Every structure is written in C-alpha cells, then in structure tokens.
Regions:
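Acidic, Mg2+-coordinating active-site environments of NTP-dependent enzymes
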Residues: 248-380, 405-407, 432-440, 446-463
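Buried hydrophobic packing segments
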Residues: 184, 188, 207-211, 339-349, ...
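A short acidic, often aromatic-flanked loop/helix-cap motif at beta-alpha or helix-coil junctions
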Residues: 202-203, 306-313, 468-474
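Phosphate-binding loop of NTP-binding sites
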Residues: 3-283, 287-297
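ATP-dependent carboxylate-amine ligase
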Residues: 1-144, 347-354, 358-368, 372-497
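Fold-independent oxyanion-binding glycine-rich loops
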Residues: 172-175, 198-199, 226-227, 250-251, ...
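Residues that form or flank phosphate/diphosphate-binding pockets in enzymes
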Residues: 179, 202-205, 232, 337, ...
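Charged, alpha-helix-enriched surfaces in structured cytosolic catalytic cores
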Residues: 202, 229-232, 260, 334-337, ...
Length: 497
C-alpha cells in the first residue's frame, strides 16, 4: 500500500509540478514566491477551498491508514483555474527552468522515498502537499549557481560598457521608470548617440543582455532602467554600470509585499545615487524631498517636480519652468513628473534648455500606459494595463472622466497587487473612485474581487464579475458602442487567481 501511495504521489507531482514551475518562472525565480501563490490559489473560491480541505483530511487520516493518503494526489486536480499551459504566460522550457525542475524532482523523490522507508503515508502525502515549497527550496539552492553562471555575461557587459566610453544615465523609482527612460532617451538623442535598455530590462541579467546586444561602437549615452526587489541589488548594478547621472522618479506603495514600508523602498532605490556625479530627484513625495535635502549636502542634486513644487525644474499645470523662469508649454497628455525628470537629466548632462525644448514634439509613449485609441465599434479605449499603481490608476480615471462622447463609461480591472497590507484598502479606494466616474465596473478574477466589490458597493455604478480578461473583453464588445468609453486598468498574468 505504501508503494502504491508513493507511485500515486509521483504521478500527481507531474501536472502539479508543471503548474507551480510556471508560477516560479513568471515570478522571476524568486524563492518563496511559489508557496505564496499556492496559498492564494488554494484559498481562492469554494472549489479550491474544498480541495484543500480534502487534502488536509487525507493528510490527517494517513497517520492511521495509508488509504487516507490517496486523497492528497486526488486533490491535485486543483487548484482550479491554474493551468499547466497558461493563456498569457505559457511555460517556457529554458535551461534555467530545466535545472529547477530537475532539482525539485530530485528533492520530491527523496521525500517520497523517505516516506516509503519509514512506511509513513503521512510523510509521502506531505511531500506532495508541500510541492510548491520544495520548488522554492530548489530555487533557493540554485540561486548562487545561477548567479555564478551569469557572471560571464555581466563581466562581458561591464567591459563593453567601459570600452565604449559612454556616459551612463541610471533611472529608478517605484513606477514611471520606463516612461522616463523613453522621454530621456528621446531628448538626449538630439545631441548624443543614445542607447536605452529595452522594455523593462531592469535587472542584472536583463541589463547585461541589453549592453551586450545593443551597445554599439560610438554610443555616447546609455540610459539604463534599474529595478530592485530588495536592498543591495541596485548597489550591485552600479558597481559595473556606474552612473554619471542617477535619477529617482517616484516612490509609492509598489512591491510593498516585499519591502514592507515606503522608507525601505527609498533606502533600496537611493543606492543608485552612491556612485553618481549628479542626482536628479523628483521631490513631489515627502520622502524623496527629504532624500534630496540629505544627499544635497554631499553631491550635486537636481530637484524636479511634476506638481508645481519648489524645484529647479518644475511643471506647473502645462508650464515648464527652470529656475523659476517659464521656458515652454508641456505637450498635452504628457506624464509631467517623468518629463520633469527627463529634462533634469538633460541639464545634468550639460545640454541647454533650448536643445531639450526643441525635442518636446514627438515624445514617445510607453505601451499600455494610458494609451487612448478608438475601437472598430466606435468606443474609446484607454489602455493602462502595465503594472498598475495607486497614483497611476487615479490618473487613468481622470483620463476616462475627460474622454468619450456622452455615452457610458466602463472600468475593467483585476485591481492592483504587491501593495502589502495596504492592498485591500487601495483597491477599495480605487473601486470607490471608479464608481463615482464610471457607469459600470467589470471586476476580473478573484485576487482583489472582495475589496473591489466592497469599494464599489456604496455607489451607483453597476458591477459585473468575470473570471478572465478574455471574458471582460467579450463583455465590452457586446455592450459598448459609439460614444462609450472603457478603461482597462491593469492586467494580471494568469498565474494570479
């Protein structure tokens, strides 16, 4: 009987393991993420909760009889909704994923073998139940190995960057990094041969790849977006990508799940200033204003503001001012704080304000960030689906409030994530604001369903709940027409419940 239970658990581990490996890959191989998502999935909806209860009953019963242990592999038909293939993010069998899969499989087999040796149905069942944690253990064990394997590409990138002689502009922030990078690269391209890191290539291996593949001979400025999930990451990046100019765009409750506080976010991101000649800091947030004052005692700081605050570069309404003097009118629908930082970067690199102002026309726009278009059916579409944050979501609602031709207004959203303990409150507040502007709210998925329903419940907007973005898009197509407008606010990948 023990052998049969072990065989059943091994067989059940294959589809279950593929599901959780996909989560690991989508979460950038961060140890601990798989178990976190397992907790979310097994408590999402009555069916998954029922399957979780079945597994727990099987584990408890297996203390007395191995027969009870068979409930654990049977329950691996769940969690319902998390597929092996994926809709938006299919499993990609990269070399790194294969290494994780092999090590996780070896750990799981060792646990099952231990259960057989001890003749313990519980020990075998707990191995399958804790499969997400075993994958996290494999990720943790392989972390140093992956880092050493990546050193070759990092060393090559560092040598290539040094040989180019290019000046480095490094940009970080809780949000707005990519848009600021695009603005800065556009403004600088009028005077320098400029290369910017593509898309959201903002970590160690992404930036190494960007430099190795895109930094051509003759490049004069390299604009690097730098992200972080914790202290020390940006410090390590600046060791081999030393910035001449370092910019901090914005601070907000993004990735609070990992950082725990905005003060810790500032401390981690402020590492970008340590090796820079000039720092450009958007001082609209009190923590960044305090940082600018503190760092200004030891290095040159260019203060900027997108909200008309006291700073060297400020955008007040639509007026761009430098050192208190009006210099130009900002283009419509521009992200003001991001533009202020980009102008500050140009000034820090020695460009004249006239050179920068002459490049304002044609500022690029990052994809899926408050992009306004018109559908074939004649309704207005606002696409703000990339990495939603509270400030950006409020701004997107302002866009929805301004557009449309008198028809219905709809908000489609799964809510915001990685906001730590403030996540429920921020989503309730967003739903409340959305209900005040929109006629209809379409809630996607289960991650923030309860908070969004609570936030919208006291207002006049009607609510529809759907399981996936595809269902939400179908609803919009069936219900909206000419004169209507829809805001798509955030789009969670389908490894979220």
């Amino acid at each position: 009987m023990i052998w049969a239970l072990a065989a059943a658990c091994v067989l059940a581990s294959v589809p279950a393991g593929l599901r959780w490996l996909r989560v690991a890959q989508r979460e950038h191989y961060l140890a601990g993420a798989v178990a976190t998502f397992a907790g979310r999935w097994w408590t999402n909806g009555p069916i998954n909760v029922a399957l979780l209860v079945v597994m727990l009953i099987g584990l408890v019963g297996s203390w007395w009889s191995p027969w009870w242990g068979f409930l654990v592999p049977l329950a691996q038909v769940g969690p319902v909704g998390l597929t092996m293939k994926g809709r938006t993010s299919p499993l990609a069998w990269t070399a790194r994923l294969r290494r994780v899969a092999v090590l996780a499989a070896l750990i799981a087999v060792a646990v099952y073998w231990g259960g057989v040796a001890l003749e313990s149905g519980f020990f075998i069942g707990i191995g399958l139940f804790l499969l997400p944690a075993l994958i996290d253990l494999a990720l943790l064990a392989l972390g140093p190995v992956e880092r050493r394997m990546g050193n070759r590409w990092v060393d090559q990138a560092a040598a290539r960057l040094e040989a180019s002689g290019a000046k480095v502009v490094a940009i970080t922030g809780s949000y707005g990094k990519t848009t600021t990078k695009l603005y800065a690269a556009h403004l600088l391209a009028g005077a320098f041969r400029t290369v910017a890191s593509p898309a959201s290539f903002n970590n160690r291996m992404g930036l190494a790849r960007a430099i190795n593949e895109q930094l051509a001979p003759g490049t004069e400025v390299f604009v690097a977006e730098m992200g972080t999930y914790g202290r020390g990451e940006i410090e390590e990046l600046t060791e081999w990508i030393p910035p001449d100019v370092a910019a901090m765009v914005a601070i907000g409750p993004v990735h609070l799940e990992r950082f725990r506080s905005e003060e810790r976010i500032v401390a981690a991101k402020a590492e970008i200033l340590d090796r820079a000649r000039v720092g450009v800091i958007a001082v609209d947030h009190p923590l960044l204003a305090a940082l600018a004052e503190e760092r200004g005692r030891e290095m040159e700081i260019m203060t900027v503001s997108g909200e008309g605050g006291a700073a060297r570069v400020t955008i007040r309404d639509s007026a761009i001012e430098v050192d208190g003097v009006w210099v130009a009118k900002a283009p419509p629908d521009v992200f003001k704080a991001n533009l202020a930082v980009a102008i500050g970067i140009g000034l820090a690199l020695g460009l004249g304000i006239d050179d920068l102002i002459s490049r304002l026309d044609g500022l690029p726009r990052a994809e899926h960030r408050q992009t306004v278009s018109r559908s074939e059916r004649g309704f207005t579409v606002i696409d703000d689906t990339f990495n939603s944050n509270p400030a950006g979501a409020r701004a997107a609602l302002g866009v929805l409030d301004r557009v449309g031709d008198g028809g219905r207004k709809v908000v489609v959203t799964p809510g915001m994530v990685e906001l730590g303990q403030s996540q429920d409150g921020e989503n309730r507040a967003f739903a409340h604001q959305a209900a005040a502007i929109a006629d209809h709210l379409v809630i996607v998925g289960g991650t923030n369903r309860r908070a969004l329903l609570e936030g919208s419940g006291k207002d006049n907007a009607s609510v529809t709940v759907v399981a996936s973005r595809d269902e939400a898009v179908d609803w919009v197509r069936e219900n909206l027409g000419p004169g209507d407008a829809v805001l798509y606010e955030n789009d969670l990948p389908d490894h979220y419940p």
